Regions:
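Extracytoplasmic
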Residues: 10-44, 61, 65, 151, ...
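Helix-to-loop junctions at the C-terminal end of transmembrane segments
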Residues: 61-73, 279-290, 377
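Helix-loop-helix hairpin linking two adjacent transmembrane segments in secondary transporters
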Residues: 139-190
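Conserved MFS/SLC helix-loop-helix module at the cytosolic interface between two early adjacent transmembrane helices
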Residues: 60-98
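A late C-terminal transmembrane helix in Major Facilitator Superfamily
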Residues: 331, 345-380
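Cytoplasmic helix-loop-helix junction between adjacent transmembrane helices
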Residues: 106-141, 347
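Extracytoplasmic gate region of multi-pass secondary transporters
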Residues: 29-36, 222-280
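C-terminal transmembrane helical hairpin of 12-TM major facilitator-type secondary transporters
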Residues: 290-341
């Protein structure tokens, strides 16, 4: 692979810590939505305009994310993400006006667009090559584990200090972690274009041959290779309804049916721990059972979790609240699906490009769910809104299975 084991491990640790500190901030904010609503004195629909702005920006920038990653490299994208995440955390903690809340979410949109999982996939692919799936799964799992610990600590700290002070401390920590990990642990990461130019001087012909040796297709080629990529992008759009729906609305769902806000925050911490262990094994599970079976497990698991939450809301049987949120954690694979599934469905020839397209599809869905689901809640109530999430999971599963069944890589492997 061209890198020592120590260098690969160091890079993976750096990526993990940056992801946990930068993208984890969004998870922490989701866990304290009831506190933020009280602090800003706004209703849920108005509050969700902020995250909607963030996801609109995320979608718009994800569409050009691969270009940005190519120009300034995945490592620097992640450093930008750390800085923006810190600013977001500080502004959310001190926001008492709706304008500050919107500005904070604009910054968060930049973070989510290209500075988290899309950039992380680019870094991991450089260091791990054909083992990218396993490495990415471990990185995602460890990231989720760290975020879960962070959320658990947050739920405890909220008892002894106001969230405004807590978020200021978090903002400083995110910058420190981001700078250290990007500059020291991850170190130098070659740009993709520079890497191609660095092919042996026997030159363009040898470089082209090396490119052709990579199995798979470019994003442009997949658009002409049948319906698989379209099914895949639709599935990524729909899965955002499930993933963003549960993480953004679970805490207010719980409190709307009588649960204390601090207990609701602890439940999201439990979700994060469950997600962490699932993500940790994701690459190995995918290699063992394949994309088709894994898709079924992800979406049926989530749907079963929603059913448990629905029953809990009517019976107040606390174990169902716990089982439900744990099963819902299967949907936490959502943002990792492009990084995990792309090699099997479309190969490694344009891993970063197709990965970025999948992330863009996800944020296109997230644009609609944050504001759309709040409207559904306003008209139908929390119970029926969560029924919609369960249905969305089953529809998403159908599209993802169609993407797997029509994958162009199946034909390529058949020819071999």
């Amino acid at each position: 692979m061209g890198y020592s084991k120590g260098k690969r491990v160091s890079a993976a640790v750096g990526v993990t810590l940056v992801l946990a500190s930068a993208s984890g901030g969004t998870s922490v904010m989701n866990a304290i939505v009831p506190f933020l609503l009280e602090g800003m004195q706004v209703n849920l629909t108005t509050f969700m305009i902020g995250p909607t702005v963030a996801t609109i920006l995320s979608f718009a920038m994800s569409a050009i994310g691969v270009k940005i990653i190519d120009i300034i490299s995945p490592k620097w994208c992640m450093l930008i993400g750390s800085v923006c995440s810190a600013l977001t955390m500080y502004m959310v903690g001190t926001a008492t006006s709706f304008v500050f809340w919107i500005i904070a979410n604009v910054l968060n949109g930049i973070v989510l667009a290209f500075a988290t999982y899309a950039a992380a996939g680019g870094v991991i692919a450089v260091f791990y090559g054909e083992n990218t799936q396993k490495a990415f799964g471990v990185v995602g799992g460890m990231t989720a584990l760290l975020v879960a610990a962070w959320m658990a600590a947050t739920s405890g700290l909220l008892h002894i200090m106001p969230y405004s002070q807590l978020f200021t401390v978090y903002a400083v920590g995110i910058v420190v972690v981001g700078v250290f990990c990007n500059l020291v642990l991850t170190g130098k990461v070659p740009r993709r274009k520079a890497t191609l130019k660095a092919q042996p001087a026997a030159g363009a012909e040898q470089g082209d041959a090396a490119s052709q040796d990579l199995p798979g297709y470019t994003f442009g080629e997949t658009l002409k290779k049948g319906a698989s990529i379209y099914f895949f992008l639709i599935a990524m759009f729909l899965v955002a309804w499930c993933a963003s729906g549960i993480t953004s609305y679970a805490s207010v769902y719980y409190t709307s049916f009588g649960m204390a806000a601090t207990t609701a925050a602890a439940m999201l911490s439990l979700y994060s721990f469950a997600a962490a262990f699932l993500k940790l094994a994701s690459g190995f599970i995918l290699k063992r059972i394949g994309a088709k079976a894994m898709s079924i497990v992800i979406y049926l698991g989530f749907a079963a979790g929603i059913v448990c939450l629905l029953v809990w809301s009517q019976t107040q049987l606390f174990p169902l609240a716990i089982v439900g949120i744990v099963l819902c954690a299967f949907i936490s694979y959502a943002t990792m699906i492009p990084g995990l599934f792309v090699p099997d469905l479309y190969g490694m020839k344009d891993y970063t490009g197709i990965n970025s397209a999948g992330v863009a599809g996800y944020y296109a869905g997230a644009v609609t769910v944050l504001f759309g689901l709040s409207i559904v809640i306003g008209f139908l109530g929390y119970f029926n809104a969560f029924v919609v999430l369960a249905i969305a999971a089953l529809v998403t599963m159908a599209f993802m299975l169609a993407a797997v069944a029509t994958s162009p890589m199946r034909g390529m492997k058949g020819k071999e």
